[in-house]
Amino acid sequence: MPDELDGGNNFGSLDCTGRRYNYAGQTYRLCDVDEDARYLASPSTNDLYFDPDATYPPPLKPDGSSYPDADYTNAWVDGYAAARTDNPVTVDLGTRYAALMDPYFHGGGFMLADGTDPNGYLDEAFYYELQDGSGCDTLIPPDSCFSARKHPSTDEEKQAFANWYAYYRTRELSSRLGITEAFIDQPESMRIGYDTINSSWVERGVRPFSGEDRTEFFEWLQTHNAGGGTPLRNALDTIGGYYESESDEGPWADEPGVEDGQSADTFIECRQSAAILMTDGYYSGGNPGVGNVDGSNGDGISGPDSETYTYESGSPYADEHSNTLADVAMEYWVRDLQPSVA
């Protein structure tokens, strides 16, 4: 935390215990940020970390009401999960806070007994403040540029830290909160679908953003845990294929998801549609093999009033690279996905 290390230890050389440790409901190696890594626990150099000058209100529930404030001495590891279970995992931020841990522990050795802390890595919740000085304006300032550990000192600051810990501290938690705020006031006339980027089909096609469909979207968003790689190109290709569907249950039907025999030539024309991809990094995984789409001229597209459009390869879209994420996006933008629609 705020986000765990990856297998390649992308944060550089950190002092992490080689013993496996049961903490916050999972098995980790605990890491010490007080030596050569203070920048990870300062809001000046890590935008995701707790900022004493910021406010951290609880996120919104699917019905628009707020989740409860977290408890500083019994803070939820996942504030969203706390609403779904009678026995949520919690941490006492007054005595047992760990700023960073590594889930990719060594397979050998033995598990440390729960509750022990032989290396002294657990402490009261803390943060570092960046100081002025020579060499302190670099991307990763040395430890000498930071203050000693500062702990929440007022009830207001402790409440803010507890809420940050329960609802904001990781990219996944922050994404849930931000997406909820972005969509909570969207009109019911909008159609929303959703999926994970690791699946080979669209989990939930577009539906009117109302009633049970609206509630189910927020519940899925706030309960789904991230996992696996980031095959963004294949994910976008899957969505593009979905938008090409002429099924009476497909995205262009009057009632998507309902099998009613509607023919494709009666679908509504010129309906604006988009796909939003959320990821924690660059794309990986398979290659859909679309080629250098943005580097080639497109076919003509007919529109209303006998108007036509043809993509002509050029700046700012064209390049010399094939099968990029931009090529997949262009593949489904440059073509008429529903040529039979009148």
Residue spans of the language-model regions?
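P/S/T/G-enriched low-complexity
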Residues: 1-342
